[in-house]
Amino acid sequence: MNKLRRLRSLSPEMAETLRLAGVQGIFWAAMAVGNYQTVYLQSIGFPATDFGLLNAIACAVAIFAMTFWGTVSDRIGSVRKIVILTLTLGCGLFIFVPLIPTGQSYSTLLFLILIPIINFFRVPMSPFVDNLTVRNCAEHRLNYGMVRSSGSLLFAVAGVITVNALIPAAGVPSTFWVMGIVMIPAIVLTYFCFEPQSGKRVKKSAAGAGVLLKNYAYM
């Protein structure tokens, strides 16, 4: 009961700091776990000559994805919703990569098609998580360094655990679905984070131009 009362007595700023630190920490822990796509592709015999093509397609998709999701975020006036959407779809689709058929004549083509589609949702995850964190820290005067350090710390911890425990015990394919599971708390915490005010749509005033023209200091 005492712990519950303490949590309820937290100021909105402190509560938001804890939420953002949780999002950053869990997000980067999940990213550390799911950082073995290239290792997996090599283990199944993905042609080395096609890695260059896959990377080229991934770069093109990254440029388009960032532009697309940035536009959508501006249109709907929400950064938080885009974070939730990209985390959910990016990780939800990523866990199915090990299920793509291997050893078939069409396997390479499937990877070249499906991985860029998955990356369309995965690439914006990190920029939008940082966007949400930076804006909320600025608007509510939170300590960004402390919030962001949780991500760096848990990234290192999760990386050590993955290399020394998860992969030896369950293999590289397990990193895909474990990443999805680890990311779930980050998605839930994001739902309860504040929506940055600067991310909301601002209704344009029809008299805006007239006001500027009458402002002699501006003219």
Show which residues each predicted segment covers.
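Helix-loop boundary and gating motifs at the non-cytosolic
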Residues: 6-60, 217-219
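C-terminal ends and interior cores of transmembrane alpha-helices
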Residues: 88-105
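Symmetry-related core transmembrane helices of the 12-TM Major Facilitator Superfamily/SLC fold
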Residues: 158, 174-192
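Juxtamembrane intracellular "pre-TM" segments in multi-pass secondary transporters
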Residues: 1-14, 193-219
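Hydrophobic core of transmembrane alpha-helices in multi-pass small-molecule transporters
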Residues: 25, 93, 105-127
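Cytoplasmic membrane-interface "Motif A"-like loop-to-helix N-cap segments
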Residues: 74-88
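Helix-to-loop junctions at the C-terminal end of transmembrane segments
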Residues: 64-78, 166-167
